[in-house]
Structures are given as C-alpha cells and as structure tokens.
Amino acid sequence: MVSVRCAECKGKLLCGRSKCPLLEKYRFLKEIKIDSRILDPSPPSIFVGRVGYPKVYAGPLVSINADPVYADSPWLWKSIEEVIRLRTSMLRVSRRFRVEDVREEKKELTEMQEMTAAIKPVDVEAEIRKISRKAEFDDVMQPMGYSAIAESIKLAENPKIPDKVEKVYYDDMKAYEALSYLYNHGFSTYYLQKIFSAGILGERKSRKLVPTRWSITAVHSIVGEAIKREIAAYKPIDKTLLFNYEHFGNHFEVILSPENYFFQLVEIWQRKSFWSPKEDWIGVDSEDIRPKRDYSNLSGGYYAARLPVLEYLREKRGQASVLVIREIKPSYYAPLGVWVVEEGVRKALKSKPEVFESFDDALTAASRRVENKEWRALVSRQTSLASFFGF
C-alpha cells in the first residue's frame, strides 16, 4: 500500500511521510544500465516468483553496480537508502519453469542450484530477451530491482559448494531434517532460505522450486519449531529481563520473564508509516510450547521475531514467557523485508538487559519507550488468558 492520491501528490509528501517511497526506489533505478548480454556476479542469490504457480519465473540475482557480497548481507546494512540502492542494483534474471522440473535434473536448473548453494560469488552469463523496469518492495522479501527474462542462463565458472550441503542433497533427507541439520551446523537462515527456494532440500521425489516469499517464512517456521521442541525440556530462566534496540525506523522491546514458554508479538504501525498512512494500527499474535498450526495474522514478521528469541533461550538452556513489541515509525518509509525484524530482535538480545523484579515492572519500563499507548490493554488481556489456561 502507498499513501492515498499518489498521482495528485507527485512526490510533494502530502501524505506526511519524510520521503516518498515511489520516488526513492526509482532514483536509484535510473542509474542501472543493462546490456542484452550480461556477464556479472551473483552473491550468490536466487529469486523464485509465485505468480502463475506452479509455473513460475526463477533465476539468479545478478549484481550490476554493487559489491555482490555486501548487497546480500542484510546484517551489515546501515540505512534504508543504502538498502534500496544495494538491492535495486541487483538484476533478477529468470526463465519459466514448472516447480517440479528440479526433479528431472535438467542442466539449466542444476547449474542454478549449484550457483545458489555456492559459498562465494559466482559469475553468471545470460542472454537477455526482455527487461521489466519495475522495482518490487514487499513486507517479507528484500527489495528487488529490475527483472529480465532470459533466452539462456549459464554459469561462467565452477562454484564451491559446502560438503554438508552436498551431503543433505545426496542423502535424500527430508526438507525439515535437512534444514535442522544445516542450521545446527552454522548455516544462516539467509543461506537456508535460498537453497530451500532452489529446490535443493527434501527427498528427490518431492523436491520443487519454492517461491522466495514462501521460503523465507518456511525456514523461520521450521527452524523455530525444531528449537521449541528442544527447549520444552528446560526450566524457566531465573530473572525478568528487558532488552531494546532500534534500527531502520523499527523499535523493539523484548521482555523475558521466568515462566513456561509463551511467545507474544505486538506489532504497532504508527500513522504515516508505510502500511498505515492514516492511523495507528496494532496487531497481536501468540503461542505456547505446542506447535503453531495456523499461519500468523502478523504474516512473516511473526516467525522472524520468534526465531532469535528461541535461539537465545536455547543458548541459555531455559524457557521464558516472552513479549516482543515492534513499533514501526514513519521513518520506515519503504518496506525492506522481515530480515529487519529478525536482525532487530537478534541485536536487541545481544545488548545488555535491564533486570526487573516482575513482568509488570519490565512492561512499565518498556512502555516509556513505546510512543503508542493503546497496546497495553491487549497485552494485559492476552497475558491473563494465558495464565488462566496454564499456557
């Protein structure tokens, strides 16, 4: 969603935002020049679309005007402007496939999988047939620049693939087993999302391309549920802790109190932020230690916020009742993807916590830093219900 009457506003900021998201993305796109034949590095990274599923466009992201490694390392990025500049310098080069085509091990798709699994940038050669000069912004995925339909796509060098990735591929592990195995051996969620999307994981007879948007949430969900099963045997932590962090116009408060596992995310979109131009919007979702069956009403941001909390609890070998507050401010003028949430909560939990005697004391302290005050009633009600039912 963009603010009302964009055609009338024409970038004059009548919506009240600090910057126009439409003009901002095209400001960088004007600098991109693309030839009919390209030979450029991929970070490596892949994009799989969802329009037309099960026939989708898929292919590598190629870096045209930026360092390919930095352009695919969200934990290093510093500002919204930098993210837009970096990501719109990446060209989506694609061809159309059926999602099941990966089972046939065609050379074109096999090379794409090898490129995606590589640990260093890989040069990609492509003959471009058609270019769409349209950028894409999404609440789950990172921003995307121009897209190009190619006559052909091939690797210009041999990629180096980690041994453990080759193991899960040739051992025919189920997808959730492969994800847990690789995650527990130190592979990042960003890497896992890419190889999951490329159809590298799972039993050979069941492998398929997975749209990028779906793969991001799937990895957060599958890995998170695996960690929940681990921490179910742990005792509650012994102190009430409060962490906070802010980046990219997203403010985070994280409260951990010594109780059995319960996770709750409160999401507050301030008026004039990207998805809520007219008024503040508040959403809440929660869970206990049982597997979360229904897809969260807060979309992929819920699973992205939950994962670093579960990582922290596993590291501390404890359970906790957890409240995460995410307040999105007007300075978040363009959606950047759920990595903003994952990294924000992760960095909050790496900071030095405040220690309190009770959850209520921590909640009061957190409230002072949250500008919207209406959310507290929702938290109080949810917490009392959780206690009543013994969650």
From Swiss-Prot:
Record motif PIP motif, residues: 382-389
MF terms in GO: zinc ion binding
Top-level division of the source organism's lineage: Archaea
Zn finger limits (C4-type): 6-20
TM region positions: none
Single biological process term from Gene Ontology: DNA repair
Keywords linked to the UniProt accession: DNA damage, DNA repair, Metal-binding, Zinc, Zinc-finger
Pfam family of the protein (one): Nre_C
Function according to Swiss-Prot or TrEMBL: Involved in DNA damage repair.
Domain notes for this protein: Contains a predicted C4 metal binding domain at the N-terminus, which could be a zinc finger DNA binding domain.
Oligomeric form and interacting partners: Interacts with the DNA polymerase sliding clamp (PCNA) via the PIP (PCNA-interacting peptide) motif.
Protein family according to the UniProt entry: Belongs to the Nre family.
Protein name: DNA repair protein NreA
Taxonomic source organism: Archaeoglobus fulgidus (strain ATCC 49558 / DSM 4304 / JCM 9628 / NBRC 100126 / VC-16)
Species lineage: Archaea, Methanobacteriati, Methanobacteriota, Archaeoglobi, Archaeoglobales
